[in-house]
Amino acid sequence: MLSEQTRTIVKSTAPVLAEHGTTITTVFYKNMFEAHPELLNIFNHANQAQGRQQAALANTVYAAAVHIDNLEAILPAVVQIANKHVSLGVKAEHYPIVGEYLLKAIKEVLGDAATDEILTAWEEAYGVIAGAFIDLEEDMYKKVENQKDGWSFFKDFKVVNKVKESDAITSFHLKPADGSNVPVYQPGQYISIRLDIPGEKYLSNRQYSLSQASRPDEFRISVKREADNDPNGVASIYLHDHVNVGDLVEISAPAGVFVLDAKNETPVAFISGGVGITPMMSMFETVATLTPKRPTTFLHAARNESLHAFDKDIQKHAATMENVSYHTVYSDQPNGFITREMLEQYVDISGEAYVCGPVPFMEAVIQHLRAMGMEDSQIHFEFFGPAAAIKQD
């Protein structure tokens, strides 16, 4: 329990963190990785290079300062981050390292303004927050390891099939190398894949959505090939060009909070852009299998037909459903965007909406859904990468 004095001091630093947060977290990561380069085997280097991880951490630290009196308010974000940590293999022993370099970064950036009183308050606050993460993640590790066919950290999987889904997306079907089955996962969850890429100094970790409904014998991930000059492209290009049937890759157990309530039978809309279609595939197939009478809408936006993955699969599942509407738009054609008018025509605002795609796409769709009268509790969305904030207007 934090003292009133500590909470007051931490809250008073919120405006400073809003102004200097990203600078602090940039210094933090730079100094921590210089002292502990082994941690680069865990973190996504591309997110570091693009500044996304720094911004995400700054947002989290700021939110903790604002809500220090009621940390329950940031519990959804904590659970989301903890899922990512468990997927990546973050351990309790890493938290003191993070705390040390975060405090040093605050002092380095703020200088004399970071008084001993402020640093002591933040040290206490970090201890409480880190303890909450450690306890939650320890419990999550136990659950994933103790579930049927579960494991913790990473396990070898064999590529048993490789399928081109579009000009940009390729699916990899993965089975445990030891011949065991895979655990049941929730539609919408992801796995982490850890790659030792020739020429790269550190391991590369990436999260990919499971793109088919849960089945006992295999996982399927569907990977978009990023541009050659994109920092995110290192892993995807390696997978597309060098990982083939028979090869082994390291996989973590399914994780994530962007999941479908498979028992709910209220109207549901899946709205995706580009590779954001991948988690929707496991959700849509699950609805088709378990609740085929559920009123369902699937809206997808792609650049063109050659980049549109899973069209035949969606039509196959839709044919087994009683109340389904499936529509696609291509941005290289006239009227090729998901507009408010389209959403008003096809989305039942009394139900649930699941949104995934590029950030500008999600911002536009979510703003339209809110304007149509949907509550935030009805709208679910997933970022591919560190969580950011959806703009309100």
Give short role names for the model-derived ranges.
Residues 147-248, 302-304, 331-333:
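Ferredoxin-reductase
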Residues 120, 234-393:
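FNR/FR-type flavoprotein reductase catalytic core
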Residues 19, 41-45, 83, 90-92, ...:
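Generic structural "secondary-structure junction" signal
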Residues 13, 35-39, 84-86, 181, ...:
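Glycine-rich, flexible loop/turn motifs
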Residues 30, 100, 186, 278-281:
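Short alpha-helical basic/polar micro-motif
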Residues 1-154:
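Globin-like tetrapyrrole-binding proteins
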Residues 37, 195, 273:
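Glycine-rich His-Gly loop
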